[in-house]
A protein has these predicted regions:
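Conserved SDR Rossmann-fold cofactor-binding beta-strand/turn motif
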Residues: 131-141, 181, 194-196
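Conserved mid-core alpha-helix of short-chain dehydrogenase/reductase
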Residues: 17-20, 63-66, 70-78, 119, ...
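Short, small/polar-rich loop/turn modules that mediate ligand/substrate recognition or access, typified
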Residues: 126, 131, 188-190
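A conserved structural motif in NAD(P)-dependent oxidoreductases
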Residues: 162-173, 184
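Short C-terminal tail/terminal secondary-structure segment
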Residues: 178, 189-211
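Conserved mid-core segment of classical short-chain dehydrogenase/reductases
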Residues: 2-62, 81, 103-106, 146-150, ...
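A glycine/serine/threonine-rich, flexible loop-to-helix segment
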Residues: 127, 137-162, 202-211
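Catalytic loop of short-chain dehydrogenase/reductase
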Residues: 42-81, 85-127, 139-141, 199
Length: 211
């Protein structure tokens, strides 16, 4: 990593800017191949959360899907010439892709699409020796999470009901990312790995039984 030069801005909503991003990376780092590509991009316009989902504008839905989901395909399309043999791409999703989470709105659809892209791209890139997986993390206290109404109550609920009786943190996700990035996971592709202290396997909250 010490050989990699600089930071490069990227507008993932456009083909041209994405192509230029990887071309510039290659130009500034001649001979360097990409072993690991981490796609940690998510965005939806504020208006997607300020009104009922039935009334979200098409343009705002398209923006959320383009940046949060379709950008994975766009990035890999232009990264392909620069990927090393056996490369690993990792993207970040959330349990709202398969179940209702209040206030998550259009991002639920974006995360569901992102997981579909993970499977599709894994199948298309697998014959070329490239792996694609996603990590579905439990709720973590981040700057972005501060804008979610009732987030502290969500953390309390998960801690009380997850099989491990705790919330996960950045180090849990980092550890799984490291594993997916390494040869230790060489036989894993197209998967969604849940890092949530086991919360995603539960149905009836333990707190109900304990009441």
């Amino acid at each position: 990593l010490s050989a990699i030069k600089g930071f490069y801005p990227l507008d993932v909503a456009q083909d041209e800017t994405t192509r230029e991003f990887f071309e510039e990376f290659s130009k500034e780092n001649p001979g360097v191949k990409i072993d690991v590509l981490v796609h940690a991009i998510g965005f939806a316009p504020r208006s997607c959360f300020d009104r009922p989902i039935l009334f979200v504008e098409d343009a705002d839905i398209n923006t959320a899907m383009t940046i949060s989901a379709n950008s994975l395909q766009r990035c890999l399309k232009f990264a392909m010439p620069y990927l090393s043999q056996g490369s690993s791409t990792i993207t970040l999703t959330y349990a709202a892709s398969t179940r209702f989470v209040p206030s998550y709105g259009i991002m639920s659809m974006a995360k569901a699409a992102l997981e579909c892209w993970t499977r599709e791209l894994a199948c298309h890139l697998g014959p070329h020796g490239h792996r694609v997986n996603s990590i579905s993390s439990g709720p973590i206290r981040t700057i972005a999470a501060q804008g979610i109404p009732g987030f502290d109550r969500i953390l309390d609920h998960v801690e009380a009901n997850a099989p491990l009786r705790r919330n996960v943190d950045q180090s849990d996700v980092a550890g799984t990312t490291l594993w997916l990035a390494s040869p230790l996971s060489a036989g894993v592709t197209g998967q969604c790995i849940h890092v949530d202290a086991g919360y995603s396997i539960t149905m009836v909250p333990q707190s109900i039984m304990d009441a």
